[in-house]
UniProtKB/Swiss-Prot annotation:
<protein>
    <recommendedName>
        <fullName>Argininosuccinate synthase</fullName>
        <ecNumber>6.3.4.5</ecNumber>
    </recommendedName>
</protein>
<feature type="binding site">
    <location>
        <position position="271"/>
    </location>
    <ligand>
        <name>L-citrulline</name>
    </ligand>
</feature>
<feature type="binding site">
    <location>
        <position position="116"/>
    </location>
    <ligand>
        <name>ATP</name>
    </ligand>
</feature>
<feature type="binding site">
    <location>
        <position position="183"/>
    </location>
    <ligand>
        <name>L-citrulline</name>
    </ligand>
</feature>
<comment type="subunit">
    <text>Homotetramer.</text>
</comment>
<feature type="binding site">
    <location>
        <begin position="9"/>
        <end position="17"/>
    </location>
    <ligand>
        <name>ATP</name>
    </ligand>
</feature>
<dbReference type="Pfam" id="PF00764">
    <property type="entry name" value="Arginosuc_synth"/>
</dbReference>
<dbReference type="InterPro" id="IPR024074">
    <property type="entry name" value="AS_cat/multimer_dom_body"/>
</dbReference>
<dbReference type="GO" id="GO:0005737">
    <property type="term" value="C:cytoplasm"/>
</dbReference>
<keyword id="KW-0028">Amino-acid biosynthesis</keyword>
<keyword id="KW-0547">Nucleotide-binding</keyword>
<feature type="binding site">
    <location>
        <position position="122"/>
    </location>
    <ligand>
        <name>L-aspartate</name>
    </ligand>
</feature>
<feature type="binding site">
    <location>
        <position position="122"/>
    </location>
    <ligand>
        <name>L-citrulline</name>
    </ligand>
</feature>
<feature type="binding site">
    <location>
        <position position="126"/>
    </location>
    <ligand>
        <name>L-citrulline</name>
    </ligand>
</feature>
<dbReference type="InterPro" id="IPR014729">
    <property type="entry name" value="Rossmann-like_a/b/a_fold"/>
</dbReference>
<dbReference type="InterPro" id="IPR001518">
    <property type="entry name" value="Arginosuc_synth"/>
</dbReference>
<keyword id="KW-0067">ATP-binding</keyword>
Length: 401
């Protein structure tokens, strides 16, 4: 019987390495796909490992700039913080991985794609809904969800089939990382009362180890896009990397979060997002300077919905596309400079300026340079308060009667 082709999202870890052998037993030829999202892995090694385990072909694609410009940028402009805390580190990368899986599957004539997600996480939903949106005719295989092995059984299978066991297998943590940040769960972190050990962190310093003097960064934006750091222009992916180092050194972006997963359970995760939290903070302050009141007050409602859609795996949904169009319209005048102080875990905005600033000092000042028409306030208050006044008059008459 002729073998079918499957494209596997391959990380180089135990689960997806074992999945190659498992899929071979199901009569598939496996094409491994590894994406460089800025996580810092030795991806050339990962690519070769897939071939050594049994893949017939192995792709390694650098998608850092695409991830930064088409995914992280939207998240920053929408100030996406799930449940007010989590900047959607993993949730942002899943639709891009799904997109590349579909592209390679179509290019290679594969009938299926596969991922290494378990049956109790959010990522299985994000991958499969995204794949269905992009190509509803592809079969989606989830080996880890299907085989239901314990960790010990999986290791035994790997040894029986000469699958290399990762040297970090004894680590209790499950880690996912990209340009936008790093997520960490499992091990002692599963106890919400336990303090995260310092070895749970990699991108940020503990507060007691951070510098005792603040560092200042000036972030330049053009139409809502971060373009410069301290006067130096960077591609967005490089700007994020550079800011991760600046802000991480000062302990910015550590997040300890018990979140409500899409699949109905609560999970405790630790995140490190130094650049993401700094950029979201700075961008919001520049919007406060450049957006009219009505847009500034309405936009958070759209932001919350965008955040939910991304978290829930609906990146390619019609509603998300429509809300993205609104978001892009709001960014036209979000151009300027924001000065941020990085110190002891905080990113504090200390200055902002823009050629599109709607702040008029002559109207805001209480000095002799004040140009605000104080006399206009009397008529404004009378008209603004008229409905309340009439309501009160009518109801007081009824009480008196």
């Amino acid at each position: 019987m002729e073998k079918k082709k499957v494209v596997l999202a391959y990380s180089g870890g135990l689960d997806t390495s074992v999945a190659i052998k498992w899929l071979q037993e199901k009569n598939y030829d496996i094409i491994a796909l590894c994406l460089d999202l800025g996580e810092g892995k030795d991806l050339a090694f990962v690519k070769e490992k897939a071939l050594s385990v049994g893949a017939i072909k192995s792709y390694m694609i650098d998608v850092q700039e695409e991830f930064a410009n088409e995914y992280a940028l939207m998240a920053m402009q929408a100030h996406t913080l799930y449940e007010g805390k989590y900047p959607l580190v993993s949730a942002l990368s899943r639709p891009l991985i799904a997109k590349k899986l579909v592209e390679i599957a179509e290019q290679e004539g594969a009938t299926a794609v596969a991922h290494g997600c378990t049956g109790k996480g959010n990522d299985q939903v994000r991958f499969e809904v995204s794949i269905q949106a992009l190509n509803p005719y592809l079969e989606v295989i989830a080996p880890v969800r299907e085989w239901k092995w314990s960790r010990e059984e999986e290791i035994a299978y790997a040894k029986e089939n000469d699958v290399p066991i990762p040297i970090n297998l004894d680590s209790p943590f499950s880690i996912d990382q990209n340009l936008w940040g790093r997520s960490n769960e499992c091990g002692i972190l599963e106890d919400p009362w336990a303090a995260p050990p310092e070895d749970a962190y990699e991108m940020t310093l503990a507060l007691e180890d951070t510098p005792n003097k603040p560092e200042f960064v000036e972030i330049g934006f053009e139409a809502g896009v971060p373009t410069t750091l301290n006067g130096t222009a960077y591609p967005l992916s490089e700007l994020i990397k550079t800011l991760n180092a600046f802000a991480g050194k000062h302990g910015v972006g550590r997040i300890d979060h018990v979140e409500n997963r899409l699949v109905g359970i609560k999970s405790r995760e630790v995140y490190e997002c130094p650049a993401a939290m700094t950029l979201i903070t700075a961008h919001k302050e520049l919007e406060d300077l450049t957006l009219v009141k009505e847009v500034a007050h309405f936009k958070p409602m759209i932001e919350q919905k965008i955040t939910e859609l991304i978290y829930n795996g609906l990146w390619f949904s019609p509603l998300k596309q429509a809300l993205h169009a609104f978001l892009q319209e709001t960014q036209k005048n979000v151009t300027g400079m924001v000065r941020v102080k990085l110190f002891k875990g905080h990113a504090i905005v200390e200055g902002r300026k823009s050629e599109y600033s709607l702040y008029d000092e002559k109207l805001a000042t209480y000095t002799a340079q004040d140009e605000f028409n104080h006399d206009a306030a009397v008529g404004f208050i009378s008209l603004f308060g008229l409905p309340t006044k009439v309501y009160s008059q009518v109801n007081q008459k009824k009480v008196e009667a």
